Curated annotation (Swiss-Prot):
Belongs to the FrdC family. It is a multi-pass membrane protein. The chain crosses the membrane at residues 30-50, 67-87, 107-127. This is Fumarate reductase subunit C. It comes from Vibrio cholerae serotype O1 (strain ATCC 39315 / El Tor Inaba N16961). HAMAP family: Fumarate_red_C (MF_00708). It comes from the Bacteria. NCBIfam families: PRK04987.1. Signal peptide: none annotated. GO terms for molecular function: succinate dehydrogenase activity. Keywords: Cell inner membrane, Cell membrane, Membrane, Transmembrane, Transmembrane helix. Part of an enzyme complex containing four subunits: a flavoprotein (FrdA), an iron-sulfur protein (FrdB), and two hydrophobic anchor proteins (FrdC and FrdD). Pfam families: Fumarate_red_C. Anchors the catalytic components of the fumarate reductase complex to the cell membrane, binds quinones.
Length: 127
């Protein structure tokens, strides 16, 4: 065994703030935090739906709280931001060819947003 001390590079907690790519990545990944709260709110809502009308009304009153509405709006914005970054990466990860030619990246991204809009419309009609 060697008595030499291995070199350990110092790393500050804020290492990711120095580079725009990593800063963007950390912000993108942080969008999951309000989504966790949104998911918990919905899970509690399902539980209150099972418990009865009084519990359901209590949950509806809770969901009408301005703080909860703000959290839900932040979760929606985070979801849209996450989707936009995912959709913009998709043509680079999976290039689509039609007739031997690459499909323009903008068309692929717009097609994904059109699919989101269509599915959202279907859900709004059904619900």
């Amino acid at each position: 065994m060697s008595n030499r001390k291995p070199y350990v590079r110092e790393m500050k907690r804020t290492w990711w703030k120095d580079h725009p790519f990593y800063r963007f990545y950390m912000v993108r990944e942080a969008t999951v935090l309000p989504l966790i709260l949104f998911t918990l709110f919905l899970t509690v809502g399902l539980g209150s739906l099972v418990k009865g009308p009084e519990a359901w009304q209590t949950w509806l009153d809770f969901m009408a709280n301005p703080l909860v509405i703000a959290i839900n709006l932040v979760a929606l914005a985070g979801s849209l931001f996450h989707a936009q970054t995912f959709f913009s990466m998709m043509p680079q990860v999976v290039p689509i060819r039609l007739g031997g030619k690459l499909v323009d990246k903008k068309i692929i991204v717009l097609a994904q947003w059109a699919a989101v809009a269509f599915i959202s419309l279907i859900v709004l009609i059904v619900v």
